[in-house]
């Protein structure tokens, strides 16, 4: 994400962020020291957001304005040639979009049953599902990774794909296709296995891999001789804060649905571990 403006902690951004959510503008607010920073997705017109913020701070009514969200420069960056240079990133994005549409954001169980960690049957209020041993014995090994491509809301899939495009793409660009593929497979398997162990097969999302790539880039820059990714320190702090919010139940309370907290934590740990493994064995 891209920082678009920074204000003091005394400024209450609630109304402005509610306005952004209402217009489906992906964003985050982080705090560091005595200031707070508004981050937006790269396809959002940053100048327009600054104009709207100034208008709002001047007493203007946000209900009377429109939001122009697309940044034409970003559209150009998502060219076919760029996707060809990042085949693993493109594959992850493509599979996520395809499978999420096939399951209709979780509404189509006849498709969803093919991508959950194990096969399952719902009878009334009870869910019965295969054990891990049975799943492996049947040879359906794709299920180890397929849950990460399922998403159950538009906001969820957009946020995850933006992180994968920005951070995952940076890893692939700087360290190679095979390196990023190994990170995705390693962290995806661990996150999915951990979440299955805790909650059964009814979960999905790339968030475990997102936490992995964030943790990986953060630690890599701290153990390498020269920083490679140079992500803001506040980003890792926000990631830990978001993880804590998930475990507190606050995210479910405000209507974001069930959160795969174990997958998030396992993904973060696997990303940190992969950074250490890569550094030691030069994967």
Regions found by a protein language model. Give the residues of each.
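A detector for small-residue-rich transmembrane helices and their helix-helix packing motifs
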Residues: 2, 9-23, 28-51, 55-57, ...
């Amino acid at each position: 994400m891209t920082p678009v403006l920074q204000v003091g902690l005394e400024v209450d951004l609630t109304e402005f962020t509610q306005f952004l959510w209402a217009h489906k503008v992906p964003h985050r607010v982080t705090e560091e020291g005595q200031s707070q920073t508004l981050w937006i997705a790269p396809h959002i017109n940053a100048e327009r957001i600054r104009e709207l913020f100034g208008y709002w701070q001047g007493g203007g009514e946000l209900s009377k304005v429109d939001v122009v969200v697309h940044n034409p420069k970003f559209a150009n960056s998502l060219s076919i040639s760029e996707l060809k240079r990042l085949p693993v990133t493109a594959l992850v994005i493509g599979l996520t979009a395809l499978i999420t549409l096939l399951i209709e954001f979780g509404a189509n169980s006849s498709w969803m049953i093919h991508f959950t960690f194990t096969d399952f049957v719902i009878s009334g209020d009870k869910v019965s599902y295969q054990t891990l041993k049975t799943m492996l014995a049947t040879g359906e090994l794709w299920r180890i990774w397929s849950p990460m491509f399922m998403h159950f809301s538009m906001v969820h899939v957009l946020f995850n794909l933006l992180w994968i495009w920005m951070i995952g793409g940076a890893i692939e660009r700087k360290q190679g296709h095979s390196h990023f593929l190994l990170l995705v497979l390693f962290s995806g398997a661990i996150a999915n296995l951990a979440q299955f162990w805790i909650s059964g097969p009814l979960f999905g999302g790339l968030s475990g891999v997102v936490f992995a790539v964030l943790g990986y880039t953060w630690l890599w820059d701290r153990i390498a001789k020269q920083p490679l990714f140079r992500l803001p320190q506040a980003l890792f702090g926000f990631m830990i804060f978001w993880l804590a919010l998930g475990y507190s139940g606050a995210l479910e309370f405000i209507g974001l649905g069930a959160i795969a907290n174990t997958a998030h934590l396992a993904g973060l740990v696997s990303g940190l571990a992969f950074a250490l493994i890569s550094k030691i064995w030069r994967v």
